């Protein structure tokens, strides 16, 4: 009985001591630790060579990578998104067009649309300011640090949240700094 067990376990032991499977070796060389850096340019093997960039292309790239362009882009995007969000929240709010002097009167379409427009514009301005502040500070922090990682968004989130919160006092500024930094870290973790 013991010999049968020893005989049955010998092939299993020999199988585990064998070399790893071929596809495991192939995977290690393609995507694993043994991967080699690419030595040849794609154009040298018959690929489509890319022409050198002209001065105009370089100038446009520099302009689009500048902090000012990123801040303007975030400002416009925040304005559009904030306006849409404001109109949406006004649309589902039951108090839009409500007159406290006459609570039983049904508001007219003009009053409802006026309130929706006011709320949309208010949200649009706030989102635009926050987007521009965050984008500009993140770009400046990234330029100063010389790195593009998650710490940039956390630092710029703290600066932006603190600047917004300091209007209400030091305690609100500290809470705004921590809250916006945590939110930025969570978003950056989720997106990367």
From Swiss-Prot:
An example Gene Ontology molecular-function term: protein transporter activity
Keywords from the named record: Disulfide bond, Membrane, Mitochondrion, Mitochondrion inner membrane, Protein transport, Translocation, Transmembrane, Transmembrane helix, Transport
Principal localisation: mitochondrion
InterPro entries: TIM22
Disulfide bonds: 67-139, 158-177
GO BP terms: protein insertion into mitochondrial inner membrane
Membrane topology: Multi-pass membrane protein
Subcellular location: Mitochondrion inner membrane
Oligomer and partners: Component of the TIM22 complex, whose core is composed of TIMM22, associated with peripheral protein FXC1/TIMM10B and the 70 kDa heterohexamer. In most cases, the 70 kDa complex is composed of TIMM9 and TIMM10 (TIMM10A or TIMM10B). A small fraction of the 70 kDa complex is composed of TIMM8 (TIMM8A/DDP1 or TIMM8B/DDP2) and TIMM13. The TIM22 complex also contains AGK and TIMM29. Interacts directly with TIMM9, TIMM10A and FXC1/TIMM10B. Interacts (when oxidized) with TIMM29; interaction is direct.
Function: Essential core component of the TIM22 complex, a complex that mediates the import and insertion of multi-pass transmembrane proteins into the mitochondrial inner membrane. In the TIM22 complex, it constitutes the voltage-activated and signal-gated channel. Forms a twin-pore translocase that uses the membrane potential as external driving force in 2 voltage-dependent steps.
Family: Belongs to the Tim17/Tim22/Tim23 family.
Protein name per the record: Mitochondrial import inner membrane translocase subunit Tim22
Lineage of the organism: Eukaryota, Metazoa, Chordata, Craniata, Vertebrata
